[in-house]
Amino acid sequence: MANPASYRPRTGEIPTNPGVYRFRDPHGRVIYVGKAKSLRSRLNSYFANPAGLLPKTYAMVHAASSVEWTVVGSELESLQLEYTWIKEFKPRFNVVFRDDKTYPYLAVTLGEKYPRVQVMRGDKRKGTRYFGPYTAGAIRETMDTLLRVFPVRSCSAGVFKRAESSGRPCLLGYIDKCSAPCVGRISPEDHRALAEDFCAFMGGEAKRFTNKLEKQMAAAVARLDYEQAARIRDDITALRKVFERNAVVLAEDTDADVFALHEDELEAAVQVFHVRGGRIRGQRGWVVEKVEDFTTPDLVEHLLQQVYGEDGETHGRLPREVLVPVAPSNAEELTEWLSGIRGARVDVRVPQRGDKAALMSTVRENAEHALKLHKTRRAGDLTVRSQALQELQEALDLPVPLLRIECFDVSHVQGTNVVASMVVVEDGLPKKSDYRKFSITGPAASDDTAAMHDVLTRRFRHYLQDKSAQVDEDVLEAGTAEAAAEAAADAAAEAAVADTTTPIPKTKFAYPPNLVVVDGGQPQVNAAARALADLGIDDVYVVGLAKRLEEVWLPDSDFPVILPRTSQGLYLLQRIRDEAHRFAISFHRQKRGKAMTVSALDGVPGLGASKRKALLAHFGSVKGVKAATPEELAQAKGIGPALAAAIVSHFTGGGPAAVTVPAINMTTGEIIET
């Protein structure tokens, strides 16, 4: 770990202006972004007494090797720049309000010809309207109930196309929970109107629809159509059941998000209730670790910045009111920023009395319970992870902590479709965004050791390339007196804002591991170590985990390291190895599936997939292609005289890749058509 004194800038070099600062690790990766009203005061607080810092801040300062800053003209600009950098660099030590992903959304795909109602998680899409978030059980119950009244399509594209081609709707079409636009029971216009009514009901206009249905029921009774009246009565009951599931907590015209938090010295739990039309429409929760000695107003500011920067900026779901437990830091600038995102005024308020204050108290109780539950669950998990990493470091006699581990596995079936996987673990937890897949061809696919050497060479060659090209885009280089003086002079002269939003090139492999784990024994370990040595890399340690006896092998060692069967370090290695194996197998199956069908046309030089399809569409089968003359072949789309001659030469034995085998489905052994 670096000594903070080795990169501490001189006090006189740091400007007293507002600005945003970044800490980088020895590999140039941004690990923390912060903002300050006075850069000098804030940065000095990191170095004056490192021993007095919070544990995570202490770890961040010692993991960094440099600090740099950018001077801005106002606190609003520093807020915007800090958010931009956190979103771009995803620093590992920043407070990140990660959704627990328990709550999906009810989505209506209004951008499609036939809108679809479905449950969705993850990134939001344009042309789709979202309601929620809700709990998984509640959303499916709501959807099932509403499809009685609004029978909107809910099937996937594949099911819809099959029904369209067969002329028969799916089961929902037969039980009247879908209007079956796939078979023409309803026009596209009427189906869209149905989907828009669904959205209007979910948006809070329930009373309009129940009143409308009550009039229809009365009309049905008047004409003695009691069966129709009974169906409408059941629809009204279903709508009221959904509508009453969310209790009215505020005035009906109230749209607000109510935030509350409960915190201790190290962590904070956040809960938010989404109130639309006076009713609680959804709930979300987060638990975050504190990096700095944040006050509650600081936490509220970061919370709103991240929640609405991600959701509101792209999807426009910012309500008119945001209720918070305490006024956030930089409240005026934050309100201005949120209003700019919404396109209309947003009020950030602290409720003092009445129904809103009572609801805030309920949300706070939820946050308190969430933090207790999180600590109960995490206590054992955090202890076990720390113990596993410590045991592994001691057993392998490594001088550095195992902050990042990468594991590689090779997968194939009798030397065909050779692939490899790379999985990443940081702080004992999988980091799936850094997982990578490799296809292996040529001589490297001849055996496992050659494949392992090839994969490690490719991965760390990328690392060396990314490392050399990573930090070229910074506008203001901190840590030098010249840069700081220039920034201070610019700010004093015209309060200019440095242009720091230039995108930095994305790097895939710029961050190296402390430990490489390979699936295999001594041969695979030696191949991996040789790949690193060939590239001149000597600060990454390599081990292998052999499956048979779960032995840990080191490079050029005649005997393995034996870890106790109850060792948490061994369990960690096994979990990483098994995850790499799973990831490699899934990629191998995917690749093998694409190659399941081989054809006699595959070996024709210059004949790609689209031209093969054109030939088969023109002649009907491979047999028809074989029987065609060059002139007939040239009539097919995309086939010129030279390619037509090559096809004829291929089938008559004149080509180098002539084949006589029929097309075969490699899974079933079925002869397709020749």
Curated annotation (Swiss-Prot):
Top-level taxon in the UniProt lineage: Bacteria
UniProt keyword annotation of DNA repair present: yes
Annotated localization: Cytoplasm
SMART domains for this protein: GIYc, HhH1
CDD domains associated with the record: GIY-YIG_UvrC_Cho
Annotated keywords: Cytoplasm, DNA damage, DNA excision, DNA repair, Excision nuclease, SOS response
Cellular component annotations (GO), alphabetically ordered: cytoplasm; excinuclease repair complex
Protein's GO biological process: nucleotide-excision repair; SOS response
PROSITE patterns in alphabetical order: GIY_YIG (PS50164), UVR (PS50151), UVRC (PS50165)
Molecular function (Gene Ontology), one example: DNA binding
Keyword Cytoplasm attributed: yes
Pfam families: GIY-YIG, HHH_5, UVR, UvrC_RNaseH, UvrC_RNaseH_dom
InterPro entries found in the cross-reference section: GIY-YIG_endonuc, GIY-YIG_endonuc_sf, GIY-YIG_UvrC_Cho, Hlx-hairpin-Hlx_DNA-bd_motif, RuvA_2-like, UVR_dom, UVR_dom_sf, UvrABC_protein_C
Residue span(s) of domain GIY-YIG: 16-95
Main location, first listed in the record: cytoplasm
Residue span, UVR domain: 207-242
Homology family: Belongs to the UvrC family.
Quaternary structure annotation from Swiss-Prot or TrEMBL: Interacts with UvrB in an incision complex.
Function: The UvrABC repair system catalyzes the recognition and processing of DNA lesions. UvrC both incises the 5' and 3' sides of the lesion. The N-terminal half is responsible for the 3' incision and the C-terminal half is responsible for the 5' incision.
Protein name (Swiss-Prot/TrEMBL): UvrABC system protein C
Organism taxonomic ancestry: Bacteria, Bacillati, Actinomycetota, Actinomycetes, Micrococcales
